Amino acid sequence: MFESKINPLWQSFILAVQEEVKPALGCTEPISLALAAAAAAAELDGTVERIDAWVSPNLMKNGMGVTVPGTGMVGLPIAAALGVLGGDAKAGLEVLKDASAKAVADAKAMLAAGHVAVMLQEPCNDILFSRAKVYSGDSWACVTIVGDHTNIVRIETDKGVVFTQADNAQEEEKTSPLGVLSHTSLEEILAFVNAVPFDAIRFILDAARLNGALSQEGLRGSWGLHIGSTLAKQCDRGLLAKDLSTAILIRTSAASDARMGGATLPAMSNSGSGNQGITATVPVMVVAEHVGADDERLARALMLSHLSAIYIHHQLPRLSALCAATTAAMGAAAGMAWLIDGRYDTIAMAISSMIGDVSGMICDGASNSCAMKVSTSASAAWKAVLMALDDTAVTGNEGIVAHNVEQSIANLCSLACRSMQQTDKQIIEIMASKAH
């Protein structure tokens, strides 16, 4: 009904959000390996007795210290075992959503028996790479995921190759809805958000539903570092003000607490990350409630936040040494500024101030401490919005911030793409030394 009102660019924007904003149960790096393992197990008729897995250094970094939902355990081995014994290979990032208590117990027993090995893929030119090879008697199956958390590129068994993805990545990039982001701007994204029919973007309200539920769970339970619930107690003790800034901080932190602590609730992810999805969603929800926004205004603000976050992250490697909660929070700054002011200049100033503030925050792997970085990023976003509302921002005379927001974004992303590669290697070396 509304398709006739939507031009091709807007359709690409909607498809890009639908492609990058998806439900995900558990941190997406171990979940990627769980999916590879589940897909491999689906190729065998017998019971899987052993698992060998190989992952890229970046995937190892993000899988070493994070809790796998429903298991109470951290790390890639339990993710691989549970993927085999309780995973649904057709469920993508929700591969473990139906894993039973028996499957969890069996997975732990498989680990205890020493039947799961996870190794670094060396050499590895792919930032995101996971391969699982599973064995049942004399039979085996192997599944490889490359480039994206759910992008299966090869399925092979002892009987031969079952599936291989054609190597046409450059052509796909040209036709992919994400490809259009290389040739657009924040101004075009804002024009889309202001004018697109509500029914075409109503689906983004699911992000508020899922990530709002995670936030509530984080405040109820003692998940992860329980930053959200701890700060809520400090409000009750009079050590922290009960105001909008604090509500943004507490509710966003709580969602990440639950996410990283292993709550069995899905997050609505952004750019392959639950924490990025939380960061792009919850601050906007809190401000929307404060200003009394209806569903349509909330949907437009969330669409601006998520699409801006995708637009910025598309200029980054899929995984890098740069904490992408910071770039997701730039999207949140845009969404919050839009709810209060709506002007492009305010949005641009807020993002520029974010780049002048939290740039360079490192990603040292997925863990409970991600909630600290999520809370810092959300607070910085709101601070940047408050400054922008008074026409104050970090200017192009300072640091890596340029005189226009598009160049500021490009400057930030060039750091992650080039200069921070050695940083990433050093982080992985430090983390690997701790594991021994």
Curated annotation (Swiss-Prot):
Record InterPro entries: Ser_deHydtase-like_asu, UPF0597
Record Pfam families: SDH_alpha
Q: Which HAMAP family match?
A: UPF0597
Q: Which family does it belong to?
A: Belongs to the UPF0597 family.
Biological processes per GO annotation = L-cysteine catabolic process to pyruvate
Q: What is this protein called?
A: UPF0597 protein YhaM
The record's GO molecular-function terms, alphabetically, read: L-cysteine desulfhydrase activity
Q: Which organism is it from?
A: Salmonella paratyphi C (strain RKS4594)
